[in-house]
Amino acid sequence: MAAAAMPLEELERWLQARVDRQPIATSLAMLDGYVAAIVAGPVSMSPLDWICPLLAIDADAFNHGDTPEFAAIFAVALRHNDISNVLRPRPTSSSRCTGANPW
C-alpha cells in the first residue's frame, strides 16, 4: 500500500495530541517556523536530525510507510518543499536580461 501524506488539518490535530511526547512543534504555525529556519539556515541538516525531534518520533518511523508517523513525515517533507519554494531567491528581471549571475 502506498503511503500518503497526512492532510494539514489532520497533522495539526496529530501534533496537538502528541504534546505529552514533547515534540518541538505542537501546531502548524510552530512547524512552519521551524521548517522555515531549517530551509533558511546556513547549514544543511539530515532530515532525520530535524524531523524526529520536530515530531517526537523515532528514526525507525521513516521505515514504515503505513503508519500515522510516516504520513506525518511525508506531510512535513511536502511542507518543507513548499516553504523552500517560497523562500528560494528568484533571479531579478535585470539579471535575466544581462546574463548576470543573480546569486
Curated annotation (Swiss-Prot):
Its main location: membrane. It is found in: Membrane. It is a single-pass membrane protein. The keyword Ribonucleoprotein does not apply. The chain crosses the membrane at residues 33-57. Keywords: Membrane, Plasmid, Transmembrane, Transmembrane helix. GO terms for cellular component: membrane. Signal peptide: none annotated. InterPro entries: YgfB-like, YgfB-like_sf. It comes from the Bacteria. Disulfide bonds: none annotated. Pfam families: UPF0149. This is Uncharacterized protein y4eI.
